[in-house]
Amino acid sequence: VSLLADKMQLSCVNRSKPGSSNKEIWKKIMSSKHEPDDVIIIGWSFAERTMFKGKQFLVSNERKDVQLYYDRLYSSKDHAEDFALRVDHINSIHKCYNLCVDKRDLRKLSTWMTSKFLNVMWEDAEKLYPRARDGNHPIELAHKHYAETLHQCIVNEDYYKRPWRLI
């Protein structure tokens, strides 16, 4: 985010928290004060990451309470509609640039959703460069490439064209 802010000659306030669910992202933005000319860039999380009773988790978690949640309470259709509602809600109040972690998540969105997502994916930049010494994270060049691509998408208003389908 700071690389992009530098490129756009803006100051940067990064309020992200790794592992946040889309519900938590929505709550953080809604409870923060924003100026009318603020540039808000939202990196939405994985569709199935959720927050329940104040705890964050993903479907892949092996804890018993998490498995119970996904077995008994979770519905991918309901979750996609909830996500679309949160994105549209924020975008109806603020001018936002939306980013999605995975293009497959965009194919699951509700047909009534009006918000757009920039046509840039982190995974595309990540694939172009080797991993850092830890073997898990990409090297700095991947971040620079992503910031440059993101900047071009904002300047050119390049949004992902969703192949809509009913969910």
Question: Which ranges hold each PLM region?
Answer:
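Serine-esterase "nucleophile elbow" of acetyl-processing enzymes
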Residues: 1-23, 33-34, 145, 153
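Alpha-helical cap/lid subdomain in secreted, periplasmic
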Residues: 30-167
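Short active-site-adjacent helix-start/loop capping segments
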Residues: 21-25, 48-51
